[in-house]
């Protein structure tokens, strides 16, 4: 027996989310059906607004309101302009920022190199990073804080090779993060130790 088309489409939509399999998608679809009309409308409005009202900062790539571009961190002149922390996504930036121990700038790649998925240097924010570094001589250190995964490691080494000839110091997070650990899943103490104990590449 098949579900009605509307439910089947809802299940299919949920199953496109990362980490959501068919069973979880079905559970979410039926949970949604049990929500009040107002809650469903608010949920739909929030989804729509997340696409229509948000953009990526034109300087660093962080997710921001279209009314706040550049983002609040890039616009904050009190930040340490000599350091740029490179992360994979906006969640990772928030995780680092919430340690309250880093006060420099950021650059969000919005992805990592992944030949298996057909994602090369031109598909993530690498060119904008190199341009940013060449345009801002005050930058003295680039901290690379990517996940401890095969793709994260490959991207880290690729960036280091690109940046080092400019004379800018390139460092990476200390190995407090075990292999396979996502930056945004690490606790604040571990992240603080990883940032403070960073090593030069």
Swiss-Prot record:
GO biological processes: DNA recombination; DNA repair
Zn finger region (C4-type): 57-74
Entry's Gene Ontology molecular function annotations: DNA binding; zinc ion binding
One Pfam entry name: RecR_HhH
Keywords: DNA damage, DNA recombination, DNA repair, Metal-binding, Zinc, Zinc-finger
HAMAP family (UniProt xref): RecR
Similarity remark: Belongs to the RecR family.
The protein, known as: Recombination protein RecR
